Design a protein with these regions (language model features):
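Ribosome-associated RNA-binding proteins
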Residues: 1-127
Length: 127
């Protein structure tokens, strides 16, 4: 039985997309999806070649956003809705990089999950 070859899903003329930014203390991950939820592209600081503690820096998050912004402008995207999640240091850097690249930000949401006294938090660091 022959397998059907799947073609890469090419979305042209997408005006508005949603950028899901997950910023942890160790890395920054950004996924670009349509408003329906179909993921168009994604990358992270680790995928760009940063290793160790450099992945969690604001500079690495800026580079991630710049790479995706260049690809989005190539697809014809003009407006971005941004969903921020997590406590990392790359949150503000991603938003600033998307604005400076020429993309308009229509909605800026913080979707960080907040527990109502759920699991026990990790112990505090003693340095």
């Amino acid at each position: 039985m022959a397998y059907k070859k799947s073609k890469k899903n090419v979305h042209k003329n997408v005006e508005t997309v949603v950028a899901h930014v997950r910023s942890t203390f160790n890395n920054t991950l950004v996924s670009i999806a349509t408003t329906d939820g179909d993921v168009l592209m994604r990358t992270s600081a680790g995928a760009l070649g940063y290793t160790g503690t450099r992945k969690g820096t604001p500079y690495a998050a800026t580079q991630v956003a710049n790479k995706l912004a260049k690809e989005m402008l190539g697809l014809g995207v003009r407006v971005v809705e941004v969903n921020l999640q997590g406590p990392g240091s790359g949150r503000d850097s991603v938003v600033r990089a998307l604005q400076s690249s020429g993309l308009g930000i229509s909605v800026l949401r913080d979707v960080t999950p907040i527990p109502h006294n759920g699991c026990r938090a990790p112990k505090k660091r003693r340095v």
